[in-house]
Amino acid sequence: MSLRIYNTLSRALEEFSPLEPGHVRMYVCGMTVYDLCHLGHARSMIAFDVVQRWLRASGLAVTYVRNITDIDDKIIKRAVENGETIRSLTDRMIDALHQDADALGIERPTHEPRATAYVPQMLDMIGTLQGKGLAYQAGNGDVNYAVRKFPGYGKLSGKSLDELNAGERVAVQDGKHDPLDFVLWKSAKPEEPADVKWRSPFGEGRPGWHIECSAMGCALLGESFDIHGGGADLQFPHHENEIAQSEGATGKPFARLWMHNGFINVDNEKMSKSLGNFFTIRDVLKEYDAETVRFFVVRSHYRSPLNYSNVHLDDARAALKRLYTALSLVAPAPVEVDWAEGYAARFKAAMDEDFGTPEAVAVLFDLAGEVNRSKSPAAAGLLKALGGHLGLLQADPQDFLKAGAGLDEAAIQAQIAARATAKAAKNFAEADRIRNDLLAQGIVLKDSASGTTWEAAQ
């Protein structure tokens, strides 16, 4: 196949072919469910939703795993603050995650494992690492990974052990052999709730964050699989540590190809909960429709930083309306996409070059221009079909164009009827007043031989 993907591990674009012919196995790091998802999470979920959609469009079967971290220091802290159990908090946040993802048109992954369901697999991997001399139990009861015992550490991030400033990056804890060593199993603390403690050969405790993804990835996709993805902030240390754990345990390459999506920035800083500069998906959806938010994300390349502002979202909304306006001119005909021809070939070439959504979106606008000129049902059908591979343009055009108007449908139709009555009575001043009043409320009237229709102003 002709698909090329940027591999963070090799720092190069690589021709992609799955390890198992015709079947792609992909793991993407998901949410830590202690709070509502913010727009940065949406960016990652949308990016890899587009990836899996295009892999399927390319004729490949896809097993897509996106995990849920449902045990973590932040989760414990929030549950204690709220006076609720870990399970109550995480169940509630997972429900909210699903509602937000569904609203944004993000397809469900094949598997969505909760970390707490895979503790036995984590303990097995920790035992294997300890048996190979790659892990040790410290005096405080924690089991740590001995980073300097794994020769390949740093190959994903491009950092050598000598270059890493452990004092800045890793909290030095009692019992570590080296400041860079990281925890695989955290021993239980007396003050911690009972529902965050598991029995183990190492004593009561809970898994570290990094071992969770290694164990779930191997359990669901095998010891070696095709693609591992996540946000750029996970490249180091999380993904670096996953490689050390998984390859240390199995002796095999973990993921063949590593993909990382860029940040969403606010005032040139990464949007994050820790910085307090984040907007939840729900906050944004109070102001903008879900497809506009998705389009805002998709029209930038997944590896590029994306700057959040109302101006950029307003522009995304106006641009998306131009595409829907073209689709409103003629009913799209069902089409069988010929990927070797014209617009479809250009769209495919864009997507086959590291999921080049900006170029693919440019093809959609060129095709919309063709629809505007030709009023061709086939061209409109192709526009809708190509947009669907990005999770776009599947709504009813009239419904989309009317969305966001200040009045409800019945009130607008009453005004249109009153204007028609005024025009019939040759009271053109009153007809113009009604048109202008509606325009002031963001509603544009369009007269034609078949009557008057309306849409929200751009």
UniProtKB/Swiss-Prot annotation:
- In this chain, ATP is annotated as bound at K273
The family database entries (CDD domains) matched by this protein are listed as: Anticodon_Ia_Cys (cd07963), CysRS_core (cd00672)
Q: Which InterPro entries match?
A: Cys-tRNA-ligase, Cys-tRNA-synt_Ia_DALR, Cys-tRNA/MSH_ligase, CysS_C, Rossmann-like_a/b/a_fold, tRNA-synt_1_cat_dom, tRNAsynth_Ia_anticodon-bd
Q: Does the keyword Signal apply?
A: no
Q: Where is this motif: 'KMSKS' region?
A: 270-274
BP-aspect Gene Ontology terms: cysteinyl-tRNA aminoacylation
- Annotated compartments: Cytoplasm
The protein's required cofactor(s) are namely: Zn(2+)
EC top class, as a word: ligase
User: Which Cys pairs does UniProt list as disulfide-bonded?
Assistant: none
Give the CC-aspect GO terms. Answer: cytosol
Q: Where does Zn(2+) bind?
A: C29, C213, H238, E242
For this protein, the record's HAMAP family field holds: Cys_tRNA_synth
The protein here is known as Cysteine--tRNA ligase
Q: Which gene name belongs to this protein?
A: cysS
